[in-house]
Amino acid sequence: MTEMITYLTELNIAITIFFGAYLLIFRKDSNFATRRVYLLFAMVASFVIPLLRFNIATPAGTLNTTLITLPEVILQGSATSTAQHTTSLTEILLVCYIAVSTFFVGKLLAGLTRIVIQSATSEKKWLNGVRVHISKELHASSFFSLIFIDPAQSNNEDLNHILEHETFHARLGHSLDRLMAEVLLVISWFNPVVWMLRKAIVVNHEYQADNRVIEHGTDQVSYQLTILNQYIGSASISNQFSNQIKNRINMINKNYKKGSSWKGLMLFPVSIALVFFMACGNEEAMNNQNAEEASNEHVQKQTEEEIFYVVEQMPQWPGEEDL
């Protein structure tokens, strides 16, 4: 129980620090490939770093530990009820955490099941040399090599742009990033930074796919009109959708800077700092645990010794026998 809480705490500290560095470094950067590598590394490192354990050896003779065992004191009354209350509160929080995590697991599995069913039952066609699944249930999307699209919802020019956009999603393997983000969400749904990270991954995928479409030779103005038609045709444009359209179009008009890939080197100092921080915390916890175990062994050894209730030989003083 304690180890799980420690792992979750360190995982969320790591992901928060990584994402904070991402906002500082990559907020206005247009090198989407480097941004993607950073976000992927941040997720993987956040899972792995808390698992690292280091044992920094202490030179012999420099550490002198003295264990003092005090008699056991049993507290009664209000102290006992307080301990029981604390235990029950911990159990309630654990049950709530597991319940919400189970909900997100079910939601993830339901989404994957829906994709599997649609891929098995939908009509397959070849459009512009790409094998697609015709589906009215799923909006234009991709999952690894599967591409879902509904030709009836778009004209020919928009359909070509949408198909090209989803094809680049599939080729770049964006579904792997999304799946990792969903797993992280299942574990750390209580951390708002994880929700922000998940959104940042999705947004960066859109920017990267848009950039590839433009680099492939698609007319920039007509492609931007396709983006507008997609949002206008789907629903009434809310403030959130309006910002998404604005940001995507701004990124399309922004020059792609390949030279900014050096920013990915920031992964190393952030990772080293986190490893050192986690290692120091783990070392202190291990030392405390070892000291506690040693103390328990000492107490157990004392309790296992023979206890005398009757004096076998009475003490005598010099000259007492002559009395």
What are these regions (language model features)?
Residues 2-294:
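Hydrophobic topogenic segments
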Residues 285-323:
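Charge-biased low-complexity segments
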